Amino acid sequence: MKRFLMMMTLIGLVGNWNSTLTAQLVSPDSLYLNEDLPEINIVAVKPLIKAEADKTTYSIAEDPDSRTYTLLEMLRKVPLVTVDGEDNVKVNGQSSFKIYMNGRPSNMFSNNPKEVLRSIPASMIKKVEVITDPGARYDAEGVSGILNIVTKGAEFEGYNASIKTTVMNLFKSVGGFATLKYGRLSLSGNYTFSQQSSESESDYLRTQSEDGGKLRMLSDVDVKYPAHYGSLEGSFEIDTLNLISLSGNLNIGNSNSIWNSHYSRLDKEGEEIYAYNEDMSKKNEWGSASLKADYQRLFKRNKEEMLTLSYQYDYIPNDIYSVFYDKDKMGNVSLPQLEADYTRQISHARTHEHTAQLDYVNPFTSIHSIEGGLKLIRRSSTSHATSEVKELDEGVWLPADLQPLVEYRHVQNICSAYAGYGFKYGKWSLNPGIRMEHTWQDVTYKQGEGKDFNYRVTDWVPSWTSAFRLDDRSLFRLAYNLRLRRPNISYLNPTVFVSGTSISYGNPGLVSEKHHRLSASYSYYGTKLNVQASVLCTLGKGVIDEYLFIDSANVVNSTYDNLVDVKAAGGNLYLSYNPSPRTSVSLNSMLHYLDLRAQEGNEVYDTDVRNSGF
C-alpha cells in the first residue's frame, strides 16, 4: 500500500497536526491551528518626485494634501518652484517662464496666473513637470523654463464627481470636478468660481538724477477679482493605434479697483512744485478661451513610434474702463492732463491665435531615437482706445487733446521646425537638438498717431542635455540651451494711458530677448530624503526693461525698451525629509548673483550704468 504525507501551511498560523494517508480515501484527523504572527502593518511610501534627463516631475496625485489643497498651494512643494508671500510664482528664481497644460502652451495663464492657479483644485492634477532645460521640441519662449501641468483623465470605468469649496480671509471659491469613462470614451470636466479681495497702501519716492528733484506718490488701493475657470477634455480610442482628443478651456474674470492717491513734485531744495489728489476707479475685463484637437497615431512595427497632429485656437479679450478725478490742485498744475477735472479712458483689445503642429518621435533601437516637427503660430491683435475729458461732474465728455483716439492692428507669425536626437546606453543619456524659429510681424495704425512698421527675424535655438544615472535614485545632469522672450501686446501697445501727471505707453519697436543658459544639477530621491542641488549661469542680451523719465512739461513718462544686459550665476537647493508617513519637512531655496548693465548703444542709459548683488 502506498502511503502519502500531507503538510498544510497557512501564513500567520501554525498547525500541530499531520496525517499519513493511504491511496484509499479516509477522513483525516482533527486539525488544530494556532496564531503564529501578531498583526503587522506594511507601509510603503511611493516617491513623489522623479528626476529625468530633461525635467523634474512631482506627482500631485500621490500626495495626500492634493485632496484639500489648491494647485497654487501644491506648487510650494515642487522642486525649483517658489511661491512668495504674495503668491507670485517663480521657476529657477525667475518669473519669466511659460505655463503649459498637458504639454501645450496655455494662454489662460496670460492674465493673473496666480488667480488661475489658485482656482484650480489640486485633486484634478496628475503631476507637475518642471522643465528647466527645454529641448528642441519646446517653444523657445520661457527664459527660466517651462511649468507643464498634466491633468487627470478618467482612469477607471464608470464616473466620478467631487465638489470643493475654499474660504479664506480674502479669498473664496467653489467648484467641482467630474470624470467619465465608458469603453473607449473618456471625459473629464472642471469648473471653479473664485472671488478675491486685496487692500494695500504704498509710499513711492523717486529721485531724478538729472536735476535732483523728487516725485512722491501715496496710494490706498482696494481691488476685487471675481473669476470663472472651466475646462472640458475628451478622448476616443479608435483602436489600439489611433487616438483622437478634444479639449477646451475658459478663463474669464474682471478686476474692480478703487485708487485714492496723492501726488507731489519737489525740486532739489525740497520746495513743492505742484501737488494734487486723485481718485480713480478702474474696471478690467479679461479672459481667454481655447479649443484644441489632437490626433495621435502609433505604428505596428514599434508601439513607441508616434505621430501627432494638433490644432489649437485661442481667443484673448482685454477691456479697460478707467475714470480719473483730479482735485485739490496746488502749485504749478497747468499741465494738459490736469486742465480738466475728469478723464475717462476706454480700451478694447482682442487677440486671435491659431496654432498648427506636427510632431514625430521614433526610438528605433533601445539606444538611439530621433524626433522632429513643424509648428505655425498666427497671432492677430487689435486695439481700439479713446481718451475723453470733462470739467464738471455733470459736464459733457469731449475728446482729450493728448491722443484722443488710437486704433491699430498687430499681426505676428511664427514658423518653426526642430530636430532632436536621443542616445541612451547604460547609465548615460545624451539629447542634443536644434530649433529654428522665423518671426515676421506687421503693425498697422488705422487711426491716431503712429507709423506703420514691420519686423523680420530668424532665430536658431540650440539645446543639449546629458545625464548620468549613478543608481536608481540619483542622477547627475549637465545642460545648455538658448531661450527667447518675445514682448506681448502690453509691451508693444502704443496707446497712452494718462494718470494725473503720469503717462504710460508701450513700445512697438521692441525685439526679442535672448538668454544663454548653462546648468549642472544633482538629484537624489529616496523614500524619506529628497535632494536636488543645481548651479547655473545665464547671459541675457537686450533684456526688456521699464524706464521712467520726466519730460520738459514735468510729465512722468513710463515705457519699455531693450536696455539691459544680464549676467547671473547662482544655485538652487531643494530638500525634503519625511521622518514618518504623516510628517514632512521641506526646504526650497535659491541664491543668485546678478550683474545688470546698460546695453551699449541704447539711447536711455549711460553705458556705465550698472547694478549688481545677491
Predicted regions and their residues:
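Transmembrane beta-barrel wall of Gram-negative outer-membrane proteins
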Residues: 170-197, 213-259, 287-291, 297, ...
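Face-selective signature of the C-terminal outer-membrane beta-barrel domain
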Residues: 229-231, 235-253, 280-444, 469, ...
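N-terminal periplasmic accessory domains that precede
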Residues: 71-74, 113-115, 130, 140-163
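Short acidic/polar hinge/loop motifs at secondary-structure boundaries
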Residues: 71, 77, 104-132
